[in-house]
C-alpha cells in the first residue's frame, strides 16, 4: 500500500495565522507544505508561475490587510485580495484541489449579538468589501466547478508574534 503525501499550498504563510499554521503542519510527515508569499517572490495576484504548482489542498491566508490603509489604497485591496483568490481558485480547479479560504471583517456593525454565520454581511470599507467579493467568488467556484470550498471567518485572533499594528489599547 502506497502512502500519499498531501501537498498543501499555504498562501500567505508569513502572516500571523499562516506562520503558526505552517509551524504546526511541519510536524506532520504526511504533509508536503508549499509555502507561497510575496516574501518568497510570488505575486499571487499576477504571477503565472502559480499555475505550474501541483497541490491537493490550498489554504488562502494571503492578502493585504488594514482598514485605514484600505481607504488610502483601495485599488490595491481589491486587486490583491480578489485576484489572489481568483488565481488560487483557478489553481484548485486545475488540480482538483480543495480550498480553505480564510476571511474576516465581513459583518460590519453588528445588528445583533452574538454575531453568528447568519448575520448579514456589510462592506463598510474597501478591505471588508474585497473580502466579501472574495468569499462570493469562492462560493461561485464551489457551485459551478464542484470545488470543495471551506470559508473560515476567525474573529479577534491573538497570540505569540502578533504585530502590534493589529492590537487595540485598552
Language-model regions, residue ranges each:
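NAD(P)-dependent short-chain dehydrogenase/reductase
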Residues: 113-114, 136-170
